[in-house]
Amino acid sequence: MNVLIISDSHGLEEELQTIAKRHEAEVDLMIHCGDSELETRHPALEPYAVVKGNCDFAGDFKDELLLTAGSRKILVTHGHLHGIKQTLLNVYYRAEELGADVICFGHSHIAGSEVLRGKLMINPGSIRLPRVRRTESYAILTLENDAATVRFYDQAGNEIEDLQNRVTL
């Protein structure tokens, strides 16, 4: 099962559509972790399951979603309500409450993934305003039995190989 994860697009429309179209045949689910700054029913967001970010004032998005991908549960949140810039423990505890195996969030605009106490945490970075790295990014999560692979891509669809992460869940 493949999941496309994107966040912090801050008003970009064409780019969201281009990325969705590029991967539509290979992914089973598309997630936007907030700060789209678009209306809830905007055509660019149509293929995505979207949560509300701290810059989303125009839509009635939910603060979090609990999605199922195969046998795994994915908590999707922007991260600002959990203070992810200070600690990942708050969002970890929320995932624990909900029984989620994977946590997808944005807010910091910093791409990366790691396992914290058995939960895979993924921040796809930002396709508009990346921080730390200068490359705009999004991610694709591949779930296979007890393994997960997270691959990151730049806006043009080129893999950012040094961010790839393969873990056991």
Swiss-Prot record:
Signal peptide: none
Gene Ontology molecular function: hydrolase activity; metal ion binding
Entry-linked Pfam families: Metallophos_2
Annotated residues for binding of Mn(2+) 2: D35, N54, H78, H107
Keyword Glycoprotein: no
Sequence similarity: Belongs to the metallophosphoesterase superfamily. YfcE family.
Keyword Hydrolase annotated: yes
PANTHER family in UniProt: VACUOLAR SORTING PROTEIN VPS29
UniProt-listed InterPro entries: Calcineurin-like_PHP_lpxH (IPR024654), Metallo-depent_PP-like (IPR029052), MPP_YfcE (IPR041802), PdiEstase_YfcE_CS (IPR020935), Phosphodiesterase_MJ0936/Vps29 (IPR000979)
Key words of the record: Hydrolase, Manganese, Metal-binding
Cofactor: Mn(2+)
Binding residues for Mn(2+) 1: D8, H10, D35, H109
Stated name of the protein: Probable metallophosphoesterase YsnB
EC number(s) reported in the record: 3.1.4.-
Cofactor binding: number and manner: Binds 2 manganese ions per subunit.
Entry superkingdom: Bacteria
Organism encoding this protein: Bacillus subtilis (strain 168)
